[in-house]
A protein has these predicted regions:
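Alpha-helical transmembrane segments of multi-pass membrane proteins
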Residues: 188-197
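Membrane-interface helix termini and inter-helical loops of multi-pass transporters
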Residues: 175-182
Length: 338
């Protein structure tokens, strides 16, 4: 019985027709769901390997959250019976806010090296999930390791900047906020630095998939990523918000219930599936964006990988008669790595 089950798993059911090109997904959503179903176990394995890189950062964040909760809890007043009073000691509250601000400052400073070390590993995971998202083969360990070796320099640069951005934004936000108390003009640079931080967060969506897909120097990767982040602003914002859904959901449940098991569930989700699933969503999105705005403008680059395509000789003739198009900023003669 076990042999029959395994044969059915690897070779399919008897009497069922062979898989043909007509059976390929017709759109991106079908491709995403089919590849997610097929690669579910592989994503879990990749997540366990990738989680190690984020463990120092998660420990730093967890310690900061616990410290903030304990600090703010000290401002709550109770009576002799242990009942919570509605009044709050304003002096204790101001001291707690100052202490919390210092804790956040120190945590963001610690997170710079913690996030910096994740860059090469993120590049490796981006390569594997990129292939899986477009129905191509990738070995979970071998290709992950090779992609780390091939892209570790650019990955390290991106992650180092990513680690510094929250720290710099927080410092500038506090500085310009204090200045704005006496002069409202300082609100303008305060908002500008916040917008720059948000824009970097949107551009990072494209940086890792781009560095493992195209032969570009670091400056070109940064420029193209910002162009795509602004040009595809609704999609870029949507992907970033989608990544935040699990964390926000578990946080809201925790605040409503104050049950520690909620945070344990969030940790378990991140440990088993969360990081790889987030990268898989990003890969599916960036594959579509790259096909539309980059691959379609590179001679010989294949587009719509993993999707059903109708081969028509007339289309080839029409392509030969097309007028040469002007190169866009991201083309620059670069070709697909793989």
């Amino acid at each position: 019985m076990f042999d029959k089950l395994m044969n059915s798993y690897y070779y399919g059911k008897s009497g069922k027709g062979d898989y043909t090109p007509d059976d390929l997904p017709k759109n991106r959503w079908q491709l995403f769901m089919e590849m997610l179903r097929t690669r579910m176990s592989g994503l879990c394995r990749m997540n366990l390997m990738y989680f190690v890189a984020w463990l120092p950062a998660m420990i730093a964040i967890a310690l900061c959250v616990v410290s903030l909760i304990m600090t703010l809890a000290g401002t709550v007043q109770v009576d002799e019976t242990g009942a919570v009073l509605d009044t709050i000691d304003q002096t204790a509250l101001r001291e707690a806010m100052q202490t919390s601000s210092d804790m956040i400052f120190v945590t963001l400073l610690i997170l710079i090296p913690c996030i910096a070390i994740t860059g090469p590993f993120t590049a490796g995971l981006s390569y594997v999930t990129r292939n899986w998202a477009r129905d191509e083969h990738a070995f979970p360990w071998a290709d992950y390791k090779d992609a780390i070796k091939a892209n570790w320099k650019q990955g390290l640069l991106v992650s180092t900047i990513t680690g510094c951005v929250p720290f710099l934004v927080y410092i500038c936000w506090r500085f310009y906020g204090d200045m704005a108390v006496g002069n409202a003009v300082w609100v303008i640079p305060q908002m500008l630095i916040l917008m720059l931080g948000i824009l970097w967060a949107l551009a990072v969506t494209y940086m890792y998939p781009m560095m493992v897909t195209y032969q570009m120097n670091f400056r070109t990767i940064i420029r193209n990523s910002f162009i795509l982040a602004v040009g595809r602003l609704p999609g870029s914002v949507g992907i970033r918000l989608l990544h935040c859904v699990p964390t926000v959901l578990f946080t809201v449940i925790f605040l409503l219930t104050l049950q520690p098991w909620v945070l344990l569930l969030l940790f378990a989700y991140s440990l088993v599936f969360g990081f790889a699933f987030s990268r898989f969503i990003t890969a599916s999105f960036t594959n579509a964006v790259f096909d539309k705005y980059i691959n379609s403008r590179i001679e010989g680059a294949q587009v719509n990988r993993g999707l059903s395509q109708e081969n028509d000789d007339d289309d080839d003739d029409d392509d030969e008669q097309e007028e040469e198009r002007e190169l866009k900023p991201w083309e620059n003669g670069y070709t697909d790595k793989h």
